[in-house]
């Protein structure tokens, strides 16, 4: 991580405290009685020419405060002068953050000039009740499988479950692209405990996909102290809040990985000497998660819709970290490697995925009935798989054969060409409106497309595209 060099004004003369004790990433600082900083205030110390930011976590008595370092403490020595900024850590905000990459303290790490614009504190209250919008509203993504089966709530939180190589990054890029184009929205990506290599790859992939200019990236990398990993999600959220509250925009906030936020909080809690709670997690787990998640919401000014990658330790859904996260999620998207192996992207498993917005009162009766019909057909097909594997298709009843044929068409039709993948696939990207998606799947369920081979449903946007491809095939065959 690129560290910021200290300026000449950060001298002993302007200091109002000094390093009293160093315990790894925990630094105790002693102040004069009339100048003790408040909890969450940011302190600055010159560590061999590099600015190290400390965040106040506890008052220890005798004018000593206990802080957590946001950077490496190697080389720090007792007696070094410390400056109280009299403010929390400040995140960069405004239009100038788009296309840029920052660390937890808001310093640029993309080898571009340092950010000099407006900044806001990362610690803020959640919006007041009177500012919230209570009516449920759908955020159209233009991605068929999501809009049909797992509709996003504006200001909602979506959990994204997927291993390596199943298309998680591409799905994130397409969501960023579609929100930017269809809703004139912006996106913020917070890499919490990310591998440095993954963050670097993501940055360059965003450049290649042409979505970087509508995105701001914030990283607290895996090799950084727990303080940086614990606070980087708040830095990203603060950037998103400014776009929502000051620019009245719909913002997409990606947090990868929300488990690392909890993990870093657990490390900090242990370093501060707090008694651990269940499974060794911090006793403040629910409070910390709630203070982050409650700020992600829709207000009368705009919305923040969050997509959060969720790591489940040892696949144990009862583990306190994922269990606490689940209580805040409105929807979950499960990416399945077996679907990806069929060449169907996005590799979303519609049977394992779910959304609380899949409600006839919110999305309408027709959409709800079509989604249930698709779900039921795919479930029946899954139930018949073992019979097909042993006895083959010929042993099925005529009704079951029809279900299998329609299910395979639905499965293929859930595939979609992405704008961000055009240069790799050679297929033009597709943004499909919800109304077109519902109408097209209804035609499959009603048997209007029973005569069309399942292969023609792959990577088509609407039913009209499938019919056109079918007619073109018939013309070719006649020749």
From Swiss-Prot:
What cellular component terms from Gene Ontology apply here? plasma membrane; proton-transporting ATP synthase complex
The catalysed reaction is: ATP + H2O + 4 H(+)(in) = ADP + phosphate + 5 H(+)(out)
State its Enzyme Commission number(s): 7.1.2.2
Q: Name one Pfam family in it.
A: ATP-synt_ab_N
Q: Which domain of life is it from?
A: Bacteria
In what way does this protein cross or attach to the membrane?
Peripheral membrane protein
Q: Does the keyword ATP-binding apply?
A: yes
The record's section on CDD domains has: ATP-synt_F1_beta_C, ATP-synt_F1_beta_N, F1-ATPase_beta_CD
Q: Which InterPro entries match?
A: AAA+_ATPase (IPR003593), ATP-synt_VA_C (IPR055190), ATP_synth_F1_bsu (IPR005722), ATPase_alpha/beta_chains (IPR050053), ATPase_F1/V1/A1_a/bsu_N (IPR004100), ATPase_F1/V1/A1_a/bsu_N_sf (IPR036121), ATPase_F1/V1/A1_a/bsu_nucl-bd (IPR000194), ATPase_F1/V1_b/a_C (IPR024034)
Enumerate the GO terms in the molecular function aspect: ATP binding; ATP hydrolysis activity; proton-transporting ATP synthase activity, rotational mechanism
Q: Which UniProt keywords apply?
A: ATP synthesis, ATP-binding, Cell membrane, CF(1), Hydrogen ion transport, Ion transport, Membrane, Nucleotide-binding, Translocase, Transport
How does this protein assemble? F-type ATPases have 2 components, CF(1) - the catalytic core - and CF(0) - the membrane proton channel. CF(1) has five subunits: alpha(3), beta(3), gamma(1), delta(1), epsilon(1). CF(0) has three main subunits: a(1), b(2) and c(9-12). The alpha and beta chains form an alternating ring which encloses part of the gamma chain. CF(1) is attached to CF(0) by a central stalk formed by the gamma and epsilon chains, while a peripheral stalk is formed by the delta and b chains.
Q: What does this protein do?
A: Produces ATP from ADP in the presence of a proton gradient across the membrane. The catalytic sites are hosted primarily by the beta subunits.
Name used for this protein in its record:
ATP synthase subunit beta
Q: Which organism is it from?
A: Mesoplasma florum (strain ATCC 33453 / NBRC 100688 / NCTC 11704 / L1) (Acholeplasma florum)
